[in-house]
């Protein structure tokens, strides 16, 4: 039968924020998104607005901006992605909406991923199939009479976020075609040291989703979104895996159980913390439960540029919160503490120093749901 909700691509990342203008200024400074289209939504622009099937009258405003893809590196270890990333920042104002609910529960964070555009007939088929599996629609709304937005309630199934499906009207309009009420341009409102910033974003290598039970979650990604193959690893502080591991500036012994997959034009890393203190448990799951913890946006191959980036970010209030050397030191990762600046998630960076030993780079095993299905 295929995926319950077939994915086209990553259309946008939905982030609930407390202060729209302040957030856009930090996105400009850190990620280089200077231009933002701002829209105000209330009963005038919203029609047939439902929350859990009940009529509601919310108001909120949004700012939509897109990263600029950096020049393609010819370095042999450079990442393959070259995809602009669109962020829709949402500041809830009044009334009931999925954004207001998220604000009440989490404050700020990645609330939804827009992954599909379907016509009305196709979406009704999708809705019925989802309902048969106990997955409902958290909210729906028609914008300017031209685009219907449906927020599928995948929070329990996939790990704390909604999946948005858009249904264009007869004219085929998408959200970006709707007129903005304002355009904000933050270029020239910040300064950076020479030779650093903004953080080069060539795409979303993966969304890091923290969950309680990895093995229970992965089959649902296959059933709902059609994710077929996962590389499974048990990351722990020991030679060849996590070396020089640190958390909040101190050495740390910890472990986490992960499944990683490239998917569509992005990817997922689903993470179950299993031992010791980490940002995943102490500052995320213990406080908020499951959800999108981070985005891998920055892949570097220049150790000097890597160090400059960390110093620059620390100087503007975005310290490195956790990290380690990986695979015998061939690679390193770190998390930049963008929680307050960007709105409830952190950004991952990866440094590729050299090609790792194939034995160290290999996962513990793969789970291939396509092969399992074919063998039945």
Enumerate the language-model features and the residues they cover.
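Core segments of cupin and vicinal oxygen chelate
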Residues: 5-7, 16-84, 125-144, 210-264, ...
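N-terminal beta-strand motif that seeds the catalytic metal site of vicinal oxygen chelate
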Residues: 1-21, 108-115, 177-215, 224-226, ...
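Short consensus segments that form the blades of beta-propeller domains
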Residues: 4, 53, 104, 198, ...
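A short, structural micro-pattern
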Residues: 59, 107-109, 146, 159, ...
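Short, tandemly repeated low-complexity microdomains enriched for cysteine and small residues
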Residues: 37-42, 91-94, 98-104, 174-179, ...
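Ordered, small/hydrophobic-rich secondary-structure cores
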Residues: 83-87, 91-148
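Vicinal oxygen chelate
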Residues: 2-4, 10-18, 62-85, 88, 100-122, 124-199, ...
